[in-house]
Every structure is written in C-alpha cells, then in structure tokens.
Amino acid sequence: MYKIVLLRHGESTWNKDNRFTGWTDVDLTEKGVEEARGAGHLLKREGYTFDLAYTSVLKRANKTLNIVLEELDSLWLPVEHSWRLNERHYGDLQGLNKAETAAKFGDDQVLVWRRSYDTPPPPLPEGDERLTSGDPRYASLPRAQFPRTECLKDTVARFVPYWETVIVPNILAGRRILIAAHGNSLRALIKYLDNISDSEIVGLNIPTAQPLVYELDANLRPIRSYYLADADTIRAAEAAVAGQGKAKG
C-alpha cells in the first residue's frame, strides 16, 4: 500500500476578500499562516514524515508548504515546483468578488463557472494586465499555450500528465509524497484518482490547509481517503468554501 497527502494552501488575501484568484500570485493572510502551522502540527502529531514534496509556482502554496515543513523540522526536504499544479485560471473573473459576481450573473451561473467540469469563465482579453505570460516562472510554457481561462477539464489535462510522468514514479519507488497545491488543481487530481463523474465533481469542495490522506493499492487505485481533522471541522470548512460563490441575501 502507498500513502500520499494532499494539502490545499492556507487562507490567502483574496480568499479572505472572497475574490476569484486563479493564477494571480497573492499571499497568505495571518489566518492562512496559522492554518498552515496547524496542518504541520497535525501531520507531526499523527507521525507523518515525507521524502519529497510537490507544489505550484504560486506563493500561497509555496509558503504553506514551507510552513508545514518547518513544523515537521523538514525544511531540507526536496521540493519540486510546477505551473501544472497551479490553481485553475479563472480568466476574466480573476480579481472579482464572488458574491458580487453572483449578484450580477446569478448563483447558478457562478456555480457553473466555479465548479462545473467543462465550462470555463470568460477569458482574459488580449493584452490584459492580468496576463502573466511574461513571468520567468512560466518560461517553459509556450506563449501560445498560456491560458487566458480554464475549466476543470483543462486543469485535469495539465495536471494528470505531470502526475503520471513525474509523481507516480516516485510513489512507486516508495517515496513518501506531500502535494501542496490549490482547491481546483486538487479537485482535478481527486476526480482522476476517484473517477468522479463530470456531474458529481460539482459538489466537491476542498477546505484550506486540511491534510487529506489517500491510501493507494499496488496499481495506485484509491483504497480509501480521509482528512486528519475531525468530521465536524471538515464539514464546516467545506460548507464555508461552498458558500463563497453565492450572492449575499
């Protein structure tokens, strides 16, 4: 049996402001830092150790991972960064308040943009200042392939090949893996691992900084998955995420 741990970053400044973030490189809030410390403490208490970690190229995931590794006294751990683990690109919604967007377009439309499998938000216009294709962290990504928007299907298409070619060989080699990423990049991986249908994936919400353990068989099929925190904590955290995209009453 193999075991991996998935972790969404702690609360970011735009999580706090209830804004669509996507590839915008925002920082953690003080609460997010404390959430990351709590995740590290929980992993340490439960006896988890790791050989290798993976994360995106966005600071909120990087900082979360570093804080967790510090709590585990494992800052020396090898870490691999890839844009393929980034949050999904939210296109022209990036920077907009979710509740205000829901009030304008309706809760149902925003739910489709946030949680559906194959419907992307409106794309960023050409030349928009929010495009970060010139950023050196994306030097390996051809400009023509740089996303201006993404749906979850697009996120699956970029993450799963990285999982199969980079992460899986290390799992099969017996290395203990921690993946610190984002709500939708983790939803993409979980959809693939658990073979969740396109319609059912709408209801999957990933809370911030809650370690999620996957136990995998010899063929890397899930045996079971579970959060380390208690069920009431997770239910409340998932409900909070689900409510972010609704208009205020």
Curated annotation (Swiss-Prot):
Catalytic activity: (2R)-2-phosphoglycerate = (2R)-3-phosphoglycerate
EC number of the protein: 5.4.2.11
Source organism superkingdom: Bacteria
Residues annotated for substrate binding in this entry: 8-15, 21-22, 60, 87-90, 98, 114-115, 183-184
Gene3D superfamilies: Phosphoglycerate mutase-like
SUPFAM superfamilies: Phosphoglycerate mutase-like
GO biological process, one term: glycolytic process
Known pathway: Carbohydrate degradation; glycolysis; pyruvate from D-glyceraldehyde 3-phosphate: step 3/5
InterPro entries tied to this protein: His_Pase_superF_clade-1, His_PPase_superfam, PG/BPGM_mutase_AS, Phosphogly_mut1
Keywords of the record: Gluconeogenesis, Glycolysis, Isomerase
Residues the record marks as site: Transition state stabilizer: 182
GO molecular function: phosphoglycerate mutase activity
Catalytic residues in the record: 9, 87
Pfam family, one: His_Phos_1
Complex formation: Homodimer.
Function: Catalyzes the interconversion of 2-phosphoglycerate and 3-phosphoglycerate.
Protein family (similarity comment): Belongs to the phosphoglycerate mutase family. BPG-dependent PGAM subfamily.
Protein name, per record: 2,3-bisphosphoglycerate-dependent phosphoglycerate mutase
Gene source species: Aromatoleum aromaticum (strain DSM 19018 / LMG 30748 / EbN1) (Azoarcus sp. (strain EbN1))
